[in-house]
């Protein structure tokens, strides 16, 4: 098999178009013969080679074909199988239009690990959307991602904030906090906020006092009260302390953009029912949270 792979690589470098057609024909035969491992090895090697020589359209075609074989042969989301798929994901440039199709197929295949998909795959997809400067598209994948996701989400929101600092920092810091609280993941809510806050205080030198609550240190901002609200919201949600929460919302008036999310959070953690039952409220508010903030674009400048 190694000899076939080397011949295919050589042909691709010599004549990308003919090599691509030849490799596809060979893979078709292997799939019909149920030699799925051999087919995957050829497709993976061929896609990598084509990405290297900047034949991204043909590379994307082979990468998507590899996922087709994964599904046809019921490949599990094992470490090796994920490694191949995520390596190819990382080679897609932003300008390659087929990247979204690859992401869609990758997420569908990863559902072999569970109905929401594989956490490592979601984290990798989120990371690539950030690389492609589409942070809003990354958010739901950070929420569904692995243990690295929360801090990466907080960092992404900070860099998004720096691209449009006319918007208050709590607008960006609040996005992961509210999304993780809706997902009932308080640790990730805290980690994302802690990461955002560290970047913000280091680069902007705001007027703050340091405080400790339940063994957690956090800054109290004099200029940005809603940043304080976010920290205290996580603490009260952890304790499920309804009275303290009601005091908080008296002291810190709700931001209009947060009202729908907070209505659901109130119900989840404090047993406060919404005044009127709204159909599909969770789907609606998650959709609004994963869209771009007011007056901001879905673009991220990390240069």
UniProtKB/Swiss-Prot annotation:
Main location: cytoplasm
Disulfide bonds: none
InterPro entries for the chain: GET4, TPR-like_helical_dom_sf
Family annotation (Pfam families): GET4
Organism domain of life: Eukaryota
Subcellular location(s) per record: Cytoplasm
Keywords, comma-separated and alphabetical: Cytoplasm, ER-Golgi transport, Transport
Any GO CC annotation of this UniProt entry: nucleus
Family statement drawn from the similarity comment of this UniProt entry: Belongs to the GET4 family.
Function, in words: May play a role in insertion of tail-anchored proteins into the endoplasmic reticulum membrane.
Protein name: Golgi to ER traffic protein 4
Protein source organism: Schizosaccharomyces pombe (strain 972 / ATCC 24843)
Gene: get4
């Amino acid at each position: 098999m190694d000899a076939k792979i080397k011949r295919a690589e050589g042909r691709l470098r010599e004549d990308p178009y003919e090599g691509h057609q030849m490799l596809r024909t060979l893979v078709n035969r292997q799939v019909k013969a149920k030699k799925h491992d051999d087919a995957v090895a050829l497709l993976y090697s061929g896609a990598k080679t084509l990405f290297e020589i900047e034949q991204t359209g043909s590379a994307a075609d082979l990468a998507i074909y590899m996922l087709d074989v994964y599904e046809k042969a019921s490949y599990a989301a094992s470490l090796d199988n994920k490694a191949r798929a995520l390596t190819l994901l990382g080679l897609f440039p932003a300008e390659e239009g087929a990247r979204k199709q690859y992401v869609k197929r990758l997420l569908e295949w990863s559902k072999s690990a569970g109905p929401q998909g594989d956490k490592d795959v979601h984290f990798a997809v989120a990371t690539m959307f950030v690389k492609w400067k589409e942070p809003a598209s990354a958010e739901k994948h950070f929420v569904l991602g692995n243990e690295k996701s929360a801090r990466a989400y907080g960092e992404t929101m900070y860099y998004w904030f720096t691209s449009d600092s006319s918007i208050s920092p709590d607008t960006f810091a609040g996005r992961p906090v509210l999304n993780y609280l809706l997902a009932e993941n308080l640790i990730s809510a805290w980690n994302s906020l802690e990461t955002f806050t560290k970047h913000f205080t280091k680069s902007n030198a705001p007027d703050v006092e340091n405080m400790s609550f339940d063994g957690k240190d956090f800054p109290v901002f004099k200029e940005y009260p809603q940043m304080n609200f976010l920290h205290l919201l996580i603490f009260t949600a952890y304790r499920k302390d309804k009275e303290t929460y009601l005091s908080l919302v008296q002291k810190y008036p709700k931001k209009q953009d947060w009202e729908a999310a907070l209505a659901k959070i109130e119900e989840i953690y404090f047993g406060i029912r919404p005044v009127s039952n709204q159909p599909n409220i969770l789907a609606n508010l998650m959709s609004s949270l994963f869209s771009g903030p007011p007056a901001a674009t879905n673009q991220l400048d990390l240069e």
